[in-house]
């Protein structure tokens, strides 16, 4: 990369990269030494020492915090960080108390894998990575309150992660009140009989162990022997979101198998309705709201009970009106009744060969089929183009018509949605139609309007062939009426019930790793789980010699998890007094998933050094509490602006909302939601290059010749991609800062385009941002002598128009995060001043400019502010205001068309009448040349736009 000043003799006081680096270092030190960006709290150790009241007007702006990777930052990472810094700086100038800081989401698999490879403790690697990232971010001049920075790996942070886990563990969800309540309030309800145990047993007749189990069944955190994604190659289970569409681990690309294991789960499904309904309260993009709605997947319909060999198989359907068209049933291969029904299954004698998958018996067919789908992800199973399944050897009774319908298992039905069983209506469902066609099953029309000989008819229509002799006749009814009448009949006959189902599953909350938050849970000799008291927090990670979970052959689906913490026997086996004397206990050897710390970190930013509470509610109320007078009567509260990538829409953001709602229910926070406003920034893209094998090669080493691209002499293919390590096209911000200056990088990234769109990086274009800053510098500083070039002089009317229009536009753009157009307006104003004042310049024209520039280019603004005689930082200088009178023109210029072609331009008073405009147009010399000797047929004035003359 070449220095733009290279090859010339720089003037002594020119704004060069060297001078920029010097200025930037000095001002960054000044900000640090003076705590320039420190935001005071109402109470606690961050409250004003003099007891001074805080401004009512505040702003809490937050970035999705980074994972401290060993590779450090590339220029794509700071895009959102710079934008939030610009927004925060602007709002400080509006007089707001602004909280803006940045922490580190530092637990996770990369540091652990590096530790496994090198023997280096993950904490050592993580802290080194954090220090490197701090250095890189510090060089950008970000105005963070460094006192509030946190790292999820700090025991003083994860102490409170564990504490929040225990709040959730020690709570239950009251479905009637639709909120979490302490477990202590559950037990009296069970004792009085007001609430039943989950299995219907008499609570008071139970023994101590059974009573504890009855209570545990209600907890928001529970252990479940459920189907999980087991990855032998990583030695851990994965959440659905960590498995790719082709059934492999997102990290490492290992096969993932479905396996039944006992795991910690969080009952996020209890909050499904609130998670959907409260989206309406949030200032989020419709795209993200839609993603969350779809992920939660609320469906209204009915549960219908089918009888099969003495067992009741319950299915969920959104179309109970199509029950008469159900010609077979399908269970998920993992459904709990599959093995029960197999014991009652008949033989395959006389069964259609297409139903048996080439096996001799139902038991053999099921075993073979389960093995064949073990490595498929849920997504892959649902999207599988080829429909497969096997007959269970039993039949179920259709409750509306008594038909005996065959029962199958098939991979397109999942245990994770509905009941794990479906009634198949092939005439009106595409997947059922494909399955029925492949296996030769009957297809019965029950909704009029299509041609089921050709395809399933999935639109609405009148019900047909839908009546029985037992009081149900929906023939001729439209969908909604038919659905309602069918549900009414099912409930009357006790064969079903109207209900709501969700796609959302409970949150798998355990990982078989080392580098994560330990669980504050121990087990007694009977295997009963006990929550540790607050006084025993944090439960710190022990030192271990081997960080590796017991990983297995990636293809070994039968392997069992063995976490690395299980090897630390002195830590695992403990003697504790939990209130009933010292006893022996065993610690839980799993760790929390990487989402735990990020599910609440915004609250620790509010009160980062509080030893007594995770967050004092008075501080929380000030920074994130509802403000109906500002945001409307339904304001849920939360962080004022949260900026990050849309890829976190259904993971981090959903989990954070869940945790926050529990904390709200328990009275620990005043805000209903963690993030009032969400803004998704785009990505910085860059050219990437692949060789003939499709392998990415280092972009820095690619050469261009005659429009083609070569790497080590071999021609390579050029493509655009998201900048990053995997595409080998990363550009380090360190290089740009060193060669151009941090302010230049900031201006360039902000000017590249709208913040919410992706944009291409081009290092060769960075010099344009530097030239703008050099022109700004030259307005104030003589490049030869270093003298200040301002003078006291009244601004002209043109100056005032340019200045006030710039102020008005820039204020609006800063407010709405349109920083690219802020830069455009500032460039336009600098160009005007450069042209108008080639020597010295009125101070009144340039002082407001420096203030307007400072949010986006703070270092040069501070330096110029100082040169113009100010002792204090520009950070808290009031942002310029504008006068309306300068925003309107006294005169306007109008094009004059003759027979539709522009032939001249006239200048008239802004309030000129149509007659005056026509008079001026006819008097214009160029127009007269076009109309001379011709008849004027028509004259049209479009106010403020144009004049059109028609001649013949």
Swiss-Prot record:
EC code: 6.1.1.4
Tell me the InterPro entries matching this sequence.
aa-tRNA-synth_I_CS (IPR001412), Leu-tRNA-ligase (IPR002302), Leu_tRNA-synth_edit (IPR025709), M/V/L/I-tRNA-synth_anticd-bd (IPR013155), Methionyl/Leucyl_tRNA_Synth (IPR015413), Rossmann-like_a/b/a_fold (IPR014729), tRNAsynth_Ia_anticodon-bd (IPR009080), Val/Leu/Ile-tRNA-synth_edit (IPR009008)
- Among the record's GO biological process terms, what is one? leucyl-tRNA aminoacylation
Broadest EC class? ligase
Cellular component GO terms held in the UniProt record = cytosol
Q: Which reaction does it catalyse?
A: tRNA(Leu) + L-leucine + ATP = L-leucyl-tRNA(Leu) + AMP + diphosphate
Q: What is this protein called?
A: Leucine--tRNA ligase
> Known Pfam families for this protein?
Anticodon_1, tRNA-synt_1_2, tRNA-synt_1g
| Organism, as annotated | Corynebacterium glutamicum (strain R)
Keywords for this entry? Aminoacyl-tRNA synthetase, ATP-binding, Cytoplasm, Ligase, Nucleotide-binding, Protein biosynthesis
The main location class comes to cytoplasm
Against HAMAP family, the record matches this protein to: Leu_tRNA_synth_B
Gene Ontology molecular functions: aminoacyl-tRNA deacylase activity; ATP binding; leucine-tRNA ligase activity
Gene giving rise to this polypeptide? leuS
Q: Where is the signal peptide?
A: none
Q: Where is this motif: 'HIGH' region?
A: 66-77
Residues annotated to bind ATP: 725
UniProt motif ('KMSKS' region) ranges: 722-726
- Places the protein is found: Cytoplasm
């Amino acid at each position: 990369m070449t220095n733009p000043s290279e090859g010339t003799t720089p003037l002594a006081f020119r704004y060069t990269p060297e001078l920029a680096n010097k200025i930037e270092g000095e001002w960054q030190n000044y900000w640090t030494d003076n705590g320039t960006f420190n935001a005071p709290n109402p109470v606690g150790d961050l409250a004003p020492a003099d007891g001074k009241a805080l401004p009512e007007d505040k702003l809490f702006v937050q970035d999705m915090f980074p994972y401290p990777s060993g590779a450090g930052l590339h220029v794509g990472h700071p895009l959102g960080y710079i934008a939030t810094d610009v927004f925060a700086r602007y709002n400080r100038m509006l007089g707001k108390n602004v909280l803006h800081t940045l922490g580190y989401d530092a637990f996770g698999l990369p540091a652990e894998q590096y530790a496994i490879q090198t023997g280096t403790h993950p904490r050592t690697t993580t802290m080194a990575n954090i220090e490197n990232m701090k250095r890189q971010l510090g060089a950008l001049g970000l105005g963070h309150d460094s006192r509030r920075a946190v790292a999820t790996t700090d025991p003083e942070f994860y102490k409170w992660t564990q504490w929040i886990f225990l709040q959730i563990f020690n709570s239950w969800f009251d479905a009637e009140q639709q909120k979490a309540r302490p477990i202590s309030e559950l037990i009296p309800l069970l004792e009085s009989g007001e609430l039943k145990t989950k299995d219907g047993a008499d609570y008071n007749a139970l023994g101590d162990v059974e009573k504890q189990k009855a209570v545990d069944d209600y907890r928001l955190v529970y252990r479940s022997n459920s189907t999980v994604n087991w990855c032998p190659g990583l030695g851990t289970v994965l959440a659905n979101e960590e498995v790719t569409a082709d059934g492999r681990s997102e990290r490492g690309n290992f096969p993932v198998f479905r396996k039944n294991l006992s795991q910690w789960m969080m009952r996020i499904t209890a909050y499904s309705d609130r998670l959907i309904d409260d989206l309406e309260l949030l200032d989020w993009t419709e795209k993200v709201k839609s993603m969350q709605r779809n992920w939660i997947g609320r469906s209204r319909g009915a549960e219908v009970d089918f009888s099969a060999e003495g067992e009741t198989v319950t299915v969920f359907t959104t179309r109970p009106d199509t029950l008469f068209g159900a010609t077979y049933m399908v269970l998920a291969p993992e459904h709990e009744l599959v093995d029960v029904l197999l014991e009652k299954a008949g033989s395959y004698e006389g069964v259609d060969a297409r139903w048996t998958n080439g096996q001799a018996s139902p038991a053999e067919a099921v075993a073979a089929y389960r093995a064949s789908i073990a490595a498929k992800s849920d997504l892959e199973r649902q999207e599988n183009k080829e429909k497969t399944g096997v007959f269970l050897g039993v039949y179920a009774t259709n409750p509306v018509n008594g038909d005996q319908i065959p029962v199958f298992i098939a991979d397109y039905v999942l245990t994770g949605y509905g009941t794990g069983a479906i009634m198949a209506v092939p005439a009106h469902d595409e997947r059922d139609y494909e399955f029925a066609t492949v296996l030769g099953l009957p297809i019965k029309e029950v909704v009029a309007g299509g041609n089921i000989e050709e395809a399933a008819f999935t639109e609405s229509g009148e019900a047909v062939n839908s009546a029985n002799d037992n009081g149900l006749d929906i023939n001729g009814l439209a969908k909604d009426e038919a659905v309602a009448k069918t549900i009414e009949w099912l409930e009357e006959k006790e064969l079903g019930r109207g209900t709501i189902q969700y796609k959302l599953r409970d949150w798998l909350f355990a990982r078989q790793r080392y580098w994560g938050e330990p669980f504050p849970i121990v087990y007694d000799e009977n295997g009963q789980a006990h929550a540790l008291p607050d006084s025993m927090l944090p439960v710190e990670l022990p030192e271990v010699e081997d960080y590796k979970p017991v990983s297995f052959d990636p293809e070994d689906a039968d392997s069992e998890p063995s976490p690395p913490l299980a090897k630390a026997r002195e830590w695992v086996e403990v003697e504790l007094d939990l209130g009933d004397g010292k006893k022996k206990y065993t610690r839980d050897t799993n760790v929390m998933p990487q989402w735990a710390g990020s599910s609440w970190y915004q609250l620790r930013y509010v009160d980062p050094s509080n030893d007594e509470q995770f967050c004092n509610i008075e501080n929380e109320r000030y920074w994130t509490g509802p403000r109906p007078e500002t945001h409307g009567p339904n304001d849920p509260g939360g962080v004022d602006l949260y900026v990050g990538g849309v890829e976190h829409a259904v993971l981090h953001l959903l989990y954070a909302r869940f945790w926050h709602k529990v904390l709200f229910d328990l009275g620990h926070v005043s805000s209903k939601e963690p993030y009032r406003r969400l803004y998704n920034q785009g990505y910085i893209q860059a050219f990437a290059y692949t060789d003939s094998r499709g392998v990415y090669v280092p972009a820095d080493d690619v050469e261009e010749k005659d429009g083609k691209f070569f790497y080590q002499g071999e021609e390579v293919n050029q493509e655009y991609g998201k900048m990053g390590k995997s595409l080998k096209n990363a550009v380090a911000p360190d290089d740009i800062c060193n060669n151009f200056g941090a302010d230049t990088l900031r201006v360039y990234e902000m000017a590249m385009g709208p913040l919410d769109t992706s944009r291409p990086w081009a290092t060769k274009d960075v010099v344009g941002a530097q030239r703008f800053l050099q022109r700004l510098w030259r307005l104030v500083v003589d490049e030869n002598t270093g003298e200040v070039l301002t003078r006291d002089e009244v601004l002209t009317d043109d100056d005032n128009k340019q200045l006030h229009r710039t102020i008005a536009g820039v204020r609006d753009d800063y407010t709405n995060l349109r920083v690219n157009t802020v830069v455009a307006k500032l460039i336009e104003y600098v160009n005007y001043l450069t042209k108008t004042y080639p020597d010295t310049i009125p101070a009144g024209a340039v002082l407001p400019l420096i203030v307007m520039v400072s949010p986006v280019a703070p270092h040069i603004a501070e330096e110029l502010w100082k040169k113009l005689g100010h002792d204090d930082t520009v950070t808290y200088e009031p942002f310029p205001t504008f006068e309306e009178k300068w925003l309107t023109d006294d005169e306007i210029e109008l094009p004059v068309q003759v027979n539709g072609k522009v032939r001249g331009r006239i200048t008239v008073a802004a309030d000129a009448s149509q007659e005056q405009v026509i008079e001026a147009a006819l008097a214009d010399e160029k127009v007269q040349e076009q109309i001379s000797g011709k008849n004027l047929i028509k004259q049209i004035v479009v106010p403020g736009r144009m004049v059109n003359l028609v001649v013949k």
